[in-house]
Amino acid sequence: MPPYLVDDPIVRQELAHYYSTVRRADDAVGEILAALQASGEADNTLVMFLSDHGMPFPFVKTQLYHHSTLTPLIFRWPGIVQENTVDDVHMVSAIDILPTLLDSVGVQIPKGIQGRSLLPLMRGESQDGWDRIFKEYAENSSGERTPMRAIETKRFLYIFNPWSNGKRRMTSATMHMNTYKRMVELAEKDEKIASRLELLTYRVVEELYDVQADPDCLVNLIADPKYQKELTDLRFLMATWMRETQDPALNAFNSRAEPKALAEFMTTQNLGAQRRREWKHAIRDSLRKANTEKVDAPERVEPVPTQP
């Protein structure tokens, strides 16, 4: 059992169901690769497999924790990628996919494109500058705005949660799962689970984890005096990246110790989210109306020609 989940029979059963879906995905990929081989184009095809971010469980899905973004990225390209090799040294991100695909077909990468080509790494080469990644989260599929930013190095993970004020609750599809519901039940009698549930629901403005010693992100080191230098360095890198990417959350980050500034930022964020929801709902309602009118419209009957 992953330590960030509750070890409980109900949770174990749901986790087993997830592992079953992973096996079915593996079966499907096998069928695709077999069809590719049968086509005769396998040696001339770059195959890329990238997982969605995180299992659909609490503390993983719709989060920026270590296991939320530690996903498989697999390449198959005969003659370029050596078989049965694993690169666990370079830290890469999804923004590197587009530059990689452009580079692989000989297209010059346009200026302003974020990310770097992974082609040298795929060839087994070693490069500098792959020692950190930045992460972003904005809102869930329902348009509930809970923006987060994070930077992860090979040793530490720093997370900034501007939405967290001790009252606002985070909503996620994981809350409809049996695992979450079981956590709620167990939290009534277990203080440790209750504490974890509170963190999941309300979070805190800043989090810091030693992902080498604590990859499950169970101990927040944000107030630990032993890690203040590392925290300062990570905050500096975060601010630099946010400036470079023109992140609208930069002012909130610089004012992270001021609840009023964070509240103003979230007011703007929620207003934008509300406008997007209204826009999406208007499109949805328009399509529903059009489909209804199409169904209700009388069917046109063409006249049958008759003999004079």
Cite the ranges covered by each PLM segment:
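Acidic/polar loop patches that form or flank catalytic/metal-binding clefts of enzymes
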Residues: 83-89, 106-116, 128-133, 159, ...
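Bilobed periplasmic-binding protein-like "clamshell/Venus-flytrap" ligand-binding domains
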Residues: 235-252
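Short beta-strand segments
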Residues: 46-51, 133-136, 159-160
